[in-house]
Amino acid sequence: MTNAVQTHTPAARAKPKKAIQGEKLRGYDKVARIPIKIIPTVEAKKKPDWIRVKLSSPAEVARIKSTLREQKLYTVCEEAACPNLPQCFADGTATFMIMGDICTRRCPFCDVGHGRPNELDKDEPRHTAETIQGLGLKYAVITSVDRDDLKDGGAMHFVEVLNESRALSPNCLIEILVPDFRGRMDIALDLLTETAPDVFNHNIETVPRLYKAFRPGSDYQHSLDLLKIYKERRPDIATKCGFMVGLGETEEEIYKLLDDLKAHNVDMITVGQYLQPSKDHAPVDRYVHPDEFQRYMDYGKKIGFFNIWAGPMVRSSYFADRQYYGEDCPAPIRSKKALAAEGKLGC
């Protein structure tokens, strides 16, 4: 296993930019000040054949992007450079990212820009609701950047989006993918307990050993507690959690992570391959084989999760409606040549 980070000072580079309100810092400027420094990637690992996405309709992708720009909205699909964007947009689905496009955290696996965010857009809840209605969505996913600058972490803004969206699209199910509300858990959970989504999702991202390197400013147990406490308050609402593999974790650590999530009453799980957004982000430690993802799904079913999706291209909101309704995880797209080489052609 290779090290994804270093604890000594790297070769000298230009001094990183300082955060200016409303300006996004990306790449080196974003990660330069995290505790464990990233070694810029010189040569990325070659992607295996199973890192593939389905071809999509350019016209539908363009239509959704046009609608989003008209309403001045962001999607995590675009801001985090999700590889599934063409497929999801062509399917008429998108994960809306509220509270702006500037995050107050500096996670080195994420492509969302860091900095000092602007004030909340008071029209964003209405614009989000109008877009959900205009696209005719039956299932919508709402996520956000971290907003450590807000007294409630942005929980009330989630509530306003929920209320506006349900007023215009009462039959649309809404999943929220929330930040950890660090230092604001009680007030955030009070608000989201009273005005609840259909699915409460929070990503734990990685195993506890890797938190200092990959989730600076976050706490593993805090994320577990957020999920457990919400389920205790609203046992009628499905809880969900996602994490990545390929950052340097071991298979045994993943099984322990799944045990922890089950012990904290999480209902649904997503597990996906980490893909490096740029040379200045954390490098890929390894590409996890589809057979290993299958072992995680088998284990998750064995210990009693309602549904677990694990695969190279799985993300927390990947076909979220299908997972909610209990469908099985789609198989990864692979070439016949690769399957034949593994003796699996026709299986």
UniProtKB/Swiss-Prot annotation:
One Pfam short name: Radical_SAM
Locations listed in the record: Cytoplasm
Reaction catalyzed: [[Fe-S] cluster scaffold protein carrying a second [4Fe-4S](2+) cluster] + N(6)-octanoyl-L-lysyl-[protein] + 2 oxidized [2Fe-2S]-[ferredoxin] + 2 S-adenosyl-L-methionine + 4 H(+) = [[Fe-S] cluster scaffold protein] + N(6)-[(R)-dihydrolipoyl]-L-lysyl-[protein] + 4 Fe(3+) + 2 hydrogen sulfide + 2 5'-deoxyadenosine + 2 L-methionine + 2 reduced [2Fe-2S]-[ferredoxin]
Pathway per the UniProt entry: Protein modification; protein lipoylation via endogenous pathway; protein N(6)-(lipoyl)lysine from octanoyl-[acyl-carrier-protein]: step 2/2
UniProt remark on cofactor binding: Binds 2 [4Fe-4S] clusters per subunit. One cluster is coordinated with 3 cysteines and an exchangeable S-adenosyl-L-methionine.
GO CC terms: cytoplasm
Enzyme Commission code(s) on record: 2.8.1.8
Family matches, as InterPro entries: Aldolase_TIM, Elp3/MiaA/NifB-like_rSAM, LIAS_N, Lipoyl_synth, rSAM
PANTHER family attached to this UniProt entry: LIPOYL SYNTHASE, LIPOYL SYNTHASE, MITOCHONDRIAL
Similarity comment text for this entry: Belongs to the radical SAM superfamily. Lipoyl synthase family.
Protein name: Lipoyl synthase
Species this protein is from: Psychrobacter cryohalolentis (strain ATCC BAA-1226 / DSM 17306 / VKM B-2378 / K5)
Encoding gene per record: lipA
